[in-house]
Amino acid sequence: MPLLAVNVDHVATIRQARLAKSPDPVAAAALAELGGARAIIVHLREDRRHIGDRDVHVLRETIKTRLHLEMAATEEMLGIALKRKPDMVCLVPEKRQELTTEGGLGVAGREAELAAYVAKLAEAGIPTSLFIDPDPRQIEASKAVGAAYVELHTGAFADAATPAARQKELDRLLAAIPLAKSQGLGVNLGHGLDYDNIYAFKDTPGVSEYSIGHSIVARAVLTGMVEAVSTMCAIIDGFPD
């Protein structure tokens, strides 16, 4: 069955709203694991707007499952990844003005640059995932640069304004999953997934992991992190491998 990876960035967002010490994303990660999360995700942005270096360090020392580090493909972040040794790195595009990641990484056209970057991580035993749109060109380029996984960007599906638009985006995703698998890539899905729209994938094989953050943290504010995570786990547990 596919696994649930919980992103705790938005716990840090609440903390940073008051420049306080709580709520602590490290504590939230521990509770997410108690609820059944099989991995914890944090995005260490260049501007450190939510997750900070301390969070990555303490999470690496304390979580019992797996740590996935989302980051831009910069030299600074490469140094941090090589030092902290996350279980996976997911390379994402990054703009300082954006509220959240707005689209997939443009891998096509940057193959040589990204291949060298991915190789440095691989030499340290760190597999790389690339956060991409469900586009055949990006999938083929991801394979070419040596990525182990792709995370298909589900944001356009989640944000679609009409049923027809949502179906169009879902069809793109459903076509991209087997294409990526045929290239030997592992497939994760993430961005904008919640307790309702996740059911669109209930009969979809080939997904290794669902990456979910905001909807779980939003529910956790009202019901607690353990309940919020366990409810999502119960949904995903019924999905095919």
From Swiss-Prot:
The entry's 3-amino-2-oxopropyl phosphate-binding residues are 7, 18, 192, 213-214
- What are the alphabetically sorted keywords of the record? Cytoplasm, Pyridoxine biosynthesis, Transferase
Reactions the enzyme catalyzes: 3-amino-2-oxopropyl phosphate + 1-deoxy-D-xylulose 5-phosphate = pyridoxine 5'-phosphate + phosphate + 2 H2O + H(+)
Which Gene Ontology cellular-component terms appear in the entry?
cytosol
Domain of life of the source: Bacteria
Which intervals of the chain form a coiled coil?
Answer: none
Q: Name where it's found.
A: Cytoplasm
Positions binding 1-deoxy-D-xylulose 5-phosphate in this chain are 9-10, 45, 50, 100
The leader peptide range reads none
- InterPro entries membership: Aldolase_TIM, PyrdxlP_synth_PdxJ, Pyridoxine-5'_phos_synth
Q: Site feature Transition state stabilizer: at which residues? A: 151
- Primary place of residence? cytoplasm
Q: Please, one GO biological process term?
A: pyridoxine biosynthetic process
One example GO MF annotation: pyridoxine 5'-phosphate synthase activity
Cystine bridges: none
Pathway as given in its UniProt record: Cofactor biosynthesis; pyridoxine 5'-phosphate biosynthesis; pyridoxine 5'-phosphate from D-erythrose 4-phosphate: step 5/5
Q: CDD domains given for it?
A: PNPsynthase
- EC annotation? 2.6.99.2
Keyword rRNA-binding set for record? no
Q: Which Pfam families match?
A: PdxJ (PF03740)
The record's function comment reads: Catalyzes the complicated ring closure reaction between the two acyclic compounds 1-deoxy-D-xylulose-5-phosphate (DXP) and 3-amino-2-oxopropyl phosphate (1-amino-acetone-3-phosphate or AAP) to form pyridoxine 5'-phosphate (PNP) and inorganic phosphate.
Regarding protein family, the annotation reads: Belongs to the PNP synthase family.
**Quaternary context:** Homooctamer; tetramer of dimers.
The record's HAMAP family line, in alphabetical order, gives: PdxJ
Q: Can you name this protein?
A: Pyridoxine 5'-phosphate synthase
Q: Which gene encodes it?
A: pdxJ
